[in-house]
C-alpha cells in the first residue's frame, strides 16, 4: 500500500540546457590559442602559495582528472602544463544574459539554476512548435551561431529526467527521454548520478546494496521511508521517473551576496574596509540586475586560522543603496572581536529580499 499518492504528469515538454564547460569555453572563444590545451579557471597555485580552488575547467583538463572544487594545487600536480586563468565574472554574466535572451525567444517559462544552466517549459511555446527536440536543436544552433559556444540539452516530460538527459551526452549532446523509455534509462544509471541525491544519501544507499536505478526500483516504498523519511518517498518516485516540480519562471532568490578569498592576507583596516566596499557595490549591482531590495545585511569574515565569523543587521526598511549597505557592513566589522591573524575571506550578503521597483538612488561610484 502506497503511503503517498503517485501522480505522474507526462504531458509537459521540458528542456534542460547546460552550457559545456562554460567559463573555460568563453575564455577559449575569446583566445583561440587556448583551444586544445588544458584550461583551468582558478588562481594559479604558483602565484598563491598553493591556495585556491578550481571553479571549472575545459574537457582537455578533465582528461587529467581535474574537476570543479578541486584545490588548484592538486590540479597543477595532476597537469603541470595546465593554463590557469583567474576568470572574469562580469564577462561570463554578460554572456549568460545573452544566452537567456535566446531562451526567451521560445518561452517565458525559464528557470535559471545558475549562470550556465536553465530549465525551459516549452509545452506552450511562443512559436507554436510541437516538438521539444526541435526547439532544443534550434536553441543549440542559436547559441552556437550568435554566442560561439556549445551546450548540451536534455528533453523529457519533467525536470528530473531532463536534467539527467542533458548530462548523458556531453559536450554538445542532445538526449530525449520519452515516458516509455524512462524506466530503462534510469535503470542503467549509477545512483550517484541521480540529481538531488547527495553524497551522504549515496553512501547510505550503497550500504543498503543500492548502486543503480534498477536496484532502487526494487526497494519497497516503506523501506525507503524507514531509512530516509519523506526523502525516501522522493527516491521511490525518482526510480519511477516521477517528478511534478514545475518550471518556476519567477524562481525566488533567498539571498544575494559577494565574497572573495584573498591569496595575500588582509591585515590593515583600510585594506579590509576597501574590500568590504567592493563587495557591497557588487551586491548592489546584483540587486539591481535581479530587481530586488533587501533588508538584512550579513558580513562574513574568515581568518587565516580558518575561524569564520558571521554577523547580520536587519534594517527598518528595504534598500539597495550602496552607501548604506557599505556603511552597515563596515560597522558590523567594527563590532567583531579583535583577531591577531590576517583575513583570508570577506563576504557581504543581502537577505530578506523582495521585488520592489521603487525609484531608489543607486550610488555605484
UniProtKB/Swiss-Prot annotation:
Residues annotated for Mg(2+) binding in this entry: 18, 116
SUPFAM superfamilies: DNA/RNA polymerases (SSF56672), Lesion bypass DNA polymerase (Y-family), little finger domain (SSF100879)
Catalytic site: 117
CDD domains with a match to the protein in the record: PolY_Pol_IV_kappa
Record keywords: Cytoplasm, DNA damage, DNA repair, DNA replication, DNA-binding, DNA-directed DNA polymerase, Magnesium, Metal-binding, Mutator protein, Nucleotidyltransferase, Transferase
Disulfide bridge partners, by residue number: none
Residue(s) at site: Substrate discrimination: 23
One Pfam match: IMS_HHH
Gene Ontology BP, a term: error-prone translesion synthesis
Broad EC category: transferase
Catalysed conversion reaction: DNA(n) + a 2'-deoxyribonucleoside 5'-triphosphate = DNA(n+1) + diphosphate
Keyword Nucleotidyltransferase belongs to the record: yes
GO cellular component terms, semicolon-separated: cytosol
Domain UmuC positions: 14-198
Main location: cytoplasm
Cofactor note: Binds 2 magnesium ions per subunit.
Gene3D superfamilies xref list: 3.30.70.270, 3.40.1170.60, 5' to 3' exonuclease, C-terminal subdomain, DNA polymerase, Y-family, little finger domain
The family this protein is said to belong to: Belongs to the DNA polymerase type-Y family.
Description of how the protein assembles with itself and partners: Monomer.
Biological role stated in the UniProt entry: Poorly processive, error-prone DNA polymerase involved in untargeted mutagenesis. Copies undamaged DNA at stalled replication forks, which arise in vivo from mismatched or misaligned primer ends. These misaligned primers can be extended by PolIV. Exhibits no 3'-5' exonuclease (proofreading) activity. May be involved in translesional synthesis, in conjunction with the beta clamp from PolIII.
Name of the protein in question: DNA polymerase IV
Species annotation: Streptococcus pyogenes serotype M3 (strain ATCC BAA-595 / MGAS315)
